[in-house]
Amino acid sequence: MGLYVVTLRLPDAFDEEFVALIPRHRAFINNLIEEGVILSYAISADRSRGWVTMHGATAEDVRGLVEQFPLARFLQSVEVDELFVFDSAATRLPKISLN
């Protein structure tokens, strides 16, 4: 299973339909995080772009899963790139305390 980063381009303006779907979208994302499919999910402060780090068999499988996001039809673009290295504090072992 590969590891991919997905770059999302969000719409310039969020209409009522988009905003109404946010809770359903967040629940969908949270479920994938709990299942270990999504490792990280981030949206830029200006709400124009997003990044999702996720597991998938192929880039096509990852794109297919992104197409199931409740907000998928509003995305202006989706880029899927397979990662060679993904390192973060969250993926490291906890520090040992020698009390």
Regions found by a protein language model. Give the residues of each.
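Conserved, structured core segments of small domains
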Residues: 1-99
